């Protein structure tokens, strides 16, 4: 790579699958990534020089289809200079280099708005909305080019704050109020919510998760501290039969959150670290029994539990989360969430940012309340296989795959996650890698 001057700035991106990759610039090692690491971005301004620069990638293969991709963008007096891996590179062992094509632009961040926040972005800017007395104007919202935002409905003065929603089999919208109760909205000729809200339940407190499945409405009622099933037993359109299927004791801050229908037909529920773990013997626990000796007197960790449709059986799927609000499944049947950071740890060496996790059975993601989180070298902690996407500061709420949306294919396969703190939606692109996925995010 030849530069007309010392660079004003230079950025490197590196991705390696099923191999360890070390990048050397002018015989100096600047970056090493493991076989299953996320895509790495690195400032290499100080590593490049005026004139000719030698870029070398040293690879060590592991089991699987090894591949590497690298790009460098350097700004000098002549403009932006680009260098990408490709067939023009030279392999030290002749005949060993194979061109596998280009990386999808979304996975490489080409044409995408960055997730990065500046130090000036106020984490508590949401407080500015507490004094709002009118609806948000669509003109103030920004979307990715090619997408349009349409306001469907604004909460009425007597409809409260909304925390979750679901569509019934007839396509009518059900919304949970933050304080208590469930509202139902009829549809107009265009299929949009219309008319006055109908109160279909006034007792359940803060239902953060709603799911229509198996001829019933399931509600994860956080402040009622239980999972409920609501049914229309007499077919008159009202959900008069309310059953408590599972009770979950504990606090309510990081509480009983979203619900999703698993590919196994069970009801998957995701909880934050305020909720007590199910008592031993009441559920089947897929995590390691070796965790017991390291739990401490108070467990305080978020977890995923799946419940049979009738509530009779339950299993803890994975644990060690902080406050993951949403859960959804991709087309392959894999579950994902968007987990919270501990904002009070910002600036400390042990700060753990918000991140996207694949919720594979048996995993412990290592979170323990406050500073009790496990180090990554504990043998049954999922950090040994590396987190999949670091999303920085934020406050995670709901997540949803676009598989049912009438979007372009690249955006049907995305996981959409809502960051409440900064009022933004992130689109997470994925590519299969073994039993898991490589991920890249963009501001949607």
Model-derived segments and their meaning:
Residues 38-42:
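Short strand-edge motifs at loop-to-beta-strand transitions and within beta-strands
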Residues 120-444:
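Beta-propeller domains with acidic blade repeats across secreted/periplasmic ectodomains
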Residues 1-10, 44-49, 400-406:
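Extracellular and analogous surface-interaction loops
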Residues 31-36:
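Short beta-strand segments within Ig-like beta-sandwich modules, predominantly Fibronectin type-III
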Residues 50-121:
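An acidic-aromatic loop/edge-strand motif
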Residues 49-50, 145:
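Surface-exposed loops/turns
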Residues 3-23, 55-57:
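Aromatic-lined ligand-binding clefts that engage carbohydrates, nucleic acids, or primary amines
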Residues 24-30:
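Short strand-turn-strand beta-turns centered on an Asx-Gly dipeptide
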């Amino acid at each position: 790579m030849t530069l007309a001057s010392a660079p004003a700035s230079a950025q490197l991106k590196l991705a390696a699958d099923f191999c360890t990759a070390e990048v050397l610039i002018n015989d100096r090692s600047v970056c090493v990534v493991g076989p299953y690491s996320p895509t790495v971005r690195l400032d290499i301004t100080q590593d490049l020089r005026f004139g000719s620069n030698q870029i070398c990638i040293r690879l060590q293969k592991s089991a699987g289809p090894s591949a590497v991709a690298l790009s460098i963008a350097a700004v000098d007096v002549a403009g932006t200079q680009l260098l990408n891996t490709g067939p023009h590179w030279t392999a030290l062992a002749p005949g060993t280099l194979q061109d596998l094509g280009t990386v999808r632009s979304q996975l490489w961040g080409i044409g995408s708005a960055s997730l990065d926040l500046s130090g000036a972005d106020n984490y508590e800017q949401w407080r500015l909305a507490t004094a709002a007395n009118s609806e948000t104007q669509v003109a103030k919202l920004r979307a990715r080019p090619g997408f349009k935002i349409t306001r469907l409905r604004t909460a009425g003065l007597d409809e409260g704050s909304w925390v979750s929603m679901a569509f019934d089999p007839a396509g009518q919208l059900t919304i949970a109020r933050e304080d208590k109760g469930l509202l139902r909205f009829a549809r107009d000729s265009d299929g949009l919510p219309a008319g006055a809200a109908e109160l279909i339940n006034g007792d359940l407190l803060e239902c953060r998760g709603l799911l229509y499945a198996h001829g019933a409405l399931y509600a994860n009622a956080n402040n009622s501290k239980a999972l409920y099933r609501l049914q229309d037993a007499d077919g008159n359109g009202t959900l008069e039969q309310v059953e408590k299927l599972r009770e979950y004791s504990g606090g309510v801050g990081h509480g009983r959150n979203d619900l999703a229908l698993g590919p196994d037909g069970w009801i998957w529920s995701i909880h934050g670290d305020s909720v007590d773990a199910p008592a031993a013997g009441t559920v089947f626990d897929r995590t390691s029994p070796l965790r017991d000796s390291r739990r401490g007197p108070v467990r305080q960790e978020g977890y995923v539990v799946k419940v049979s449709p009738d509530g009779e059986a339950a299993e803890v799927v994975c644990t060690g989360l902080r406050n993951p609000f949403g859960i959804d499944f991709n087309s392959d049947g894999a579950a994902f969430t968007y987990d919270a950071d501990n904002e009070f740890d910002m600036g400390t060496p042990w700060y753990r940012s918000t991140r996207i996790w694949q919720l594979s059975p048996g995993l412990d993601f290592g979170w323990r309340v406050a500073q009790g989180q496990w180090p990554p070298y504990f043998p049954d902690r999922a950090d040994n296989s590396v987190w999949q996407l670091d999303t920085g500061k934020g406050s995670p709420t709901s997540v949803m795959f676009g598989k049912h949306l009438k979007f372009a294919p690249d955006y049907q396969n995305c996981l959409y996650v809502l960051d409440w703190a900064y009022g933004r939606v992130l689109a997470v692109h994925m590519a299969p890698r073994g039993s898991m996925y490589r991920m890249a995010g963009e501001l949607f």
